[in-house]
Amino acid sequence: MSIRIHPQEQIDAKSRSGALGPIAPLLLPNLQRLYSQRAERLRMLADGHPLTDYLCFAATLADAQQQALFDNPLTLDLAPVVANAAANGTPPLATQTFARTPHWQRLLLAIIAELRPQAPVHVLPVLEGLEKCAAGEREALASALLAGDYAAVGSDRALFLWAALSLYWAQMASQLPGRAQAEYGEQRHVCPVCGSMPVSSVVHIGGSNGLRYLHCSLCESEWHMVRVKCSNCEESRDLSYWSLESEQAAVKAESCGDCGSYLKILYQEKDSGVDAVADDLATLLLDAKMEEAGFARSSLNPFLFPGE
């Protein structure tokens, strides 16, 4: 099964025929406090953590995203985009085909301005370099980053470019009209909004109690994926669950013997404050254990890009 976003009128017609189920296949981002709450979570996790300094810096970057969001609102008419994507069976905000506007660069400059007074000394040259480079060069770097060409960008610049691009995509995703529905098809392992990889998955409480959603590493949307099924290849016969603590741990890794990949699962019932990005970043020791066991990560954390 795959998830597609359709114009509201198409969904209404199918709804009258009873085609929609009770499970929300897609949860678009609520940006009101997303980044400030992530910053709070990162600071809480940083207390006594071996990576205290980096987690605190990540929190500062999340705060900068929240302020840039407040200072740079975005309003777009995305109805034509959704209609075109529905007709072609593609994500409406697909990173490789969606025409970016200069807004994301304004977000980048706003984030840099927020960070500069409190950034570590070794980070300042990176921020200044991004600030001074030409708009066309920034666009080229963004295209390379979104295409997964991390070596062409460098992990130092990728962090800040992605922070701006992610905020831009999240602003658009939060405004998408229409609704999503599950359909037969492939590509369930990537975001139905933008086509990006997940960062981790979250088992919800509340209205979506017990349901697992994959959290997009770019646009912050979440899409439903049934539990006890590999999020990468959708096989279910050889899954194992790993944790650093006990079976009651709030963060586990689900490994698949069929494709050799793993993805972390965060359980809100164990800790209601878990954040898909923050808790993934704070459990890098679990990643190390999974790699030692021979599994490859099937996700991307926006605070941790591969080196050159």
Curated annotation (Swiss-Prot):
GO terms (BP aspect): protein maturation
Pfam families: FdhE_C, FdhE_central, FdhE_N
UniProt entry keywords in alphabetical sequence: Cytoplasm
GO molecular-function terms, A-Z: ferric iron binding
Keyword set includes DNA damage: no
Gene Ontology CC: one annotated term: cytosol
Top-level taxonomic group: Bacteria
Subcellular location: Cytoplasm
HAMAP family: FdeH
Family: Belongs to the FdhE family.
NCBIfam families listed in its UniProt record: FdhE (TIGR01562), PRK03564.1 (NF002925)
Record's protein name: Protein FdhE homolog
Organism field: Edwardsiella ictaluri (strain 93-146)
Lineage, top ranks: Bacteria, Pseudomonadati, Pseudomonadota, Gammaproteobacteria, Enterobacterales
Gene this chain is encoded by: fdhE
